[in-house]
Amino acid sequence: MKNSIEIEIPEMGKIKFESLRDTNKKSKNIPIKNSKYIKTISYNELEKYLNNEYILSLLKKRNKIRVFESKAINMISRYRYDVFVKYYYVQSYITKTNYKLAKEIYLEHIKSFNNFSEPDGRKEKPEDFINNFNKLIKNIQKDGIDKTIIPITKNGEIIDGAHRLAIALYFNLKVPFVMFDLLDANYNKQFFINRGFNEKYAKIIDKEIVEKNNYNIDLEGIKKWRKKIIQKYLWYCVP
């Protein structure tokens, strides 16, 4: 496989894919830390779990696919800044705090990402994204995330499922995932800013979610954030 390649994606333009390594990921074997094998499924079953024909078309067909799971905190990455934006929305939606601002930031980052249009055609305007996300939050809050699977690259970067990962992160859930030999896309903070995401919104996300103004996620930062999330989760569960 080539070290890097540019692919034209509808509504997004040319996106560079390369081999990336985040400090939150392992360098050998299963890239997601503290992962556990849970089952093997067929390619047809994967289609049901993904429910996204466009993403499925990118994945190499295999007869048997091994499914693993790990805590959502182990799957975050500096290369997926959008997960933190989505987390801020989930937090505001659930707690009913700063929701108007969170909605503005969420829609701004979606606009800079794909201009409110996804390759599978299921979401084509801002209201579609808001309604779909709200429904997803309610469903996962009620039923968990076991009915879906998130595909990742061999380096541990998610290929699809940023909304689901953000919700799982908020509720401290374990996330089922499968690995595919694909290159990684660098959707870091600068990616969004370069495409029009307002820097004042980025500063809010850095302060409220990432807790590092320069957004340099390191192992110590991950540990501190994990502790805070677990504390919040325990508080949320107390009747």
Write out the residue ranges for each language-model feature.
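Extended, charge-rich helix/loop segments that form flexible
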Residues: I55-F116
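Short alpha-helix boundary/capping and kink motifs at helix termini
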Residues: L101-E157
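Active-site or metal-binding loop neighborhoods of secreted/extracellular toxin and effector enzymes
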Residues: F177-V238
